[in-house]
Regions:
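Generic start-of-chain signal for non-secretory N-termini
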Residues: 1-21, 28
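N-terminal cofactor/phosphate-binding cores enriched in small/glycine residues
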Residues: 18-20, 24-39, 43-44
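Short, small/acidic-rich helices and loops at N termini and domain boundaries
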Residues: 44-46, 54
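Duplex nucleic acid-engaging cores and interfaces of nucleic-acid transaction enzymes
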Residues: 51-54, 61, 65-310, 315, ...
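Generic structural marker for isolated residues within well-ordered, non-membrane alpha-helices
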Residues: 6, 33, 113
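Short hydrophobic beta-strand that contains or immediately precedes a catalytic carboxylate
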Residues: 318-319
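Single conserved hydrophobic/aromatic residue that forms the stacking wall/gate
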Residues: 323-332
Length: 332
């Protein structure tokens, strides 16, 4: 496992495996990044602080994914649903988003509408609708009218809830919506009604709409701050109509009454389950990227301040205590 980590980090950063191993060894021994960069160049092969930090970050992320995979495998194993093929796929996946998509159908859920419908015995009806061969689904649904299922429409609604959850957990469907968000996601912000005066400093964002991928980090962070303060309502949305059409092309294979039931379930799935889930994903990712970019800008600005002459034209002598008992003096 550790050697696999070394290979992946090496491929991602373009740094040799030997340098990765040596650097991680120093970090595991408790050495700090500045110390390694300054005093252990002969061990790391001359890596600078940025490269060492990247190695550390990649290693920590891989460790987190490995722990998550262990939890996922144990959970699915306890359900008795872990096949050899599924286990192999999980073990070979190192993309966190894909890993969570694979796990989603097996993830323990609170009592959803679909789960309530299953408990009413409506899953066979949902399967029948998905096949889209039955010309009279209402007649078949009548067989399920008993107990908590009050009428035919109640049975069909429960079956649609099951189909909607199935659509929302389908990897291809999720990637389709995810790609739409990535290509055409629009960030929209509107001031909360009645908070106009309190939100004066955010007036530039009272009614704004722009492409998420083109939104600058400082604007995105300002909008998210205002949202956290309860002053703006913020949303991210792709072309809803196009997304639904793509999903219908994937799941709806007939114009008969069963196909119409599936189409209705697909529309519900997108609006109620898929879109909110992917929107949350993109909100988190875009905020993280904006934070990283802001940190880089602040770090560079601070670097310029620290490099500025503190005393103008006056002479300055600096003393650097070396790792050995020696010291180096510089007169500027």
């Amino acid at each position: 496992m550790i050697q696999h980590f070394h290979r992946m980090i090496s491929a991602a950063l373009g740094i040799s495996e030997k340098q990765i191993v040596q650097t991680l060894g120093l970090l595991n021994d408790g050495a700090t990044i500045p110390f390694i960069s300054r005093y252990r160049k002969e061990v790391t092969g001359g890596l600078d602080e940025v490269q060492i930090e990247s190695i550390k970050t990649h290693y920590e992320k891989l460790n987190e994914i490995a722990k998550r995979k262990e939890t996922i495998l144990n959970t699915i194993q306890e359900q008795g649903k872990l096949t050899t093929e599924l286990q192999k796929r999980i073990e070979e996946t190192w993309d966190n988003t894909l890993l969570e998509d694979i796990y989603l159908p097996y993830k323990p859920k609170r009592k959803t509408r679909a789960e309530a419908a299953r408990q009413k015995g409506l899953e066979p009806l949902a399967t029948l609708l998905m096949l889209q061969r039955e010309p009279h689904p209402e007649e078949r649904a009548a067989n399920y009218v008993k107990g908590d299922v009050k009428n035919v429409e109640d049975a069909l609604k429960g079956a649609r809830d099951i189909i909607a959850e199935h659509v929302s957990e389908d990897e291809r469907a999720r990637n389709s919506v995810r790609n739409a968000f990535a290509r055409q996601g629009t960030l929209t912000a509107k001031v909360v009604k009645g908070k106009e005066e309190e939100a004066t400093k955010y007036r530039d964002y009272f009614d704004c709409s722009e492409s998420l991928k083109r939104c600058s980090s400082h604007r995105l962070l300002a909008i998210r701050r205002a949202e956290a303060e309860g002053l703006l309502k913020v949303s991210i949305s792709p072309d809803d109509e196009e997304c639904v059409e793509r999903l219908e092309r994937q799941f709806v294979r007939s114009n008969n009454p069963c196909g119409q039931q599936v189409a209705e379930a697909v529309q519900d799935s997108y609006k109620r389950l898929l879109k909110p889930s992917i929107e949350t994903e993109f909100a988190t990712q875009s905020k993280e990227r904006a934070d990283e970019e802001a940190i880089k800008v602040f770090a560079e600005n601070l670097r310029q301040l620290l490099l500025a002459s503190p005393l103008g034209q006056k002479r300055v002598m600096g003393i650097c205590l070396l790792y050995t008992s020696d010291a180096a003096d510089d007169l500027i």
